[in-house]
């Protein structure tokens, strides 16, 4: 019988060994549990056109599942809006919440492979923190992820990615994400 050894994601190892210590030295926390960390990553793909064509949601679900390695949750409209020809209960998006090792591997792939593949990429805006150390940013298309075959894309779909941290302030969150490798623009 072979035993499968569990491989710890390299970014998680780097966080535990180097980044936590560096953050503790920089902000002088009185307790080791106060050092900020990443809780979860939420990847959301809104497909507003799915209200008119229900087949579009299937492509979004397929792309999200390929990118994240997890089956997305289909989000439905909470209330009807006549101007958008939207009825309550219609599928309008897909969402994946990543935690644990999948989260660390996704952040690693995002920072090292996907973001550098964006054309004319000059860094992420440092102003998109929510006041509590969480960071949200949007991507215009899904083709920068190497798991997606560019020839199989039926249409470009953007997505929102939210990185939820335990940081109390935006500055702590910014330092944490910068140490994890997020390329922020220099103001």
From Swiss-Prot:
GO terms for biological process: translation. Keywords: Ribonucleoprotein, Ribosomal protein, RNA-binding, rRNA-binding, tRNA-binding. Pfam families: Ribosomal_L5 (PF00281), Ribosomal_L5_C (PF00673). GO terms for cellular component: ribonucleoprotein complex; ribosome. GO terms for molecular function: rRNA binding; structural constituent of ribosome; tRNA binding. InterPro entries: Ribosomal_uL5 (IPR002132), Ribosomal_uL5_bac-type (IPR020930), Ribosomal_uL5_C (IPR031309), Ribosomal_uL5_dom_sf (IPR022803), Ribosomal_uL5_N (IPR031310). It comes from the Bacteria. The keyword RNA-binding applies. PANTHER family: 60S RIBOSOMAL PROTEIN L11-RELATED. Part of the 50S ribosomal subunit; part of the 5S rRNA/L5/L18/L25 subcomplex. Contacts the 5S rRNA and the P site tRNA. Forms a bridge to the 30S subunit in the 70S ribosome. This is one of the proteins that bind and probably mediate the attachment of the 5S RNA into the large ribosomal subunit, where it forms part of the central protuberance. In the 70S ribosome it contacts protein S13 of the 30S subunit (bridge B1b), connecting the 2 subunits; this bridge is implicated in subunit movement. Contacts the P site tRNA; the 5S rRNA and some of its associated proteins might help stabilize positioning of ribosome-bound tRNAs. Belongs to the universal ribosomal protein uL5 family. HAMAP family: Ribosomal_uL5_B. This is Large ribosomal subunit protein uL5. The lineage of its organism: Bacteria, Bacillati, Actinomycetota, Actinomycetes, Pseudonocardiales. The gene is rplE.
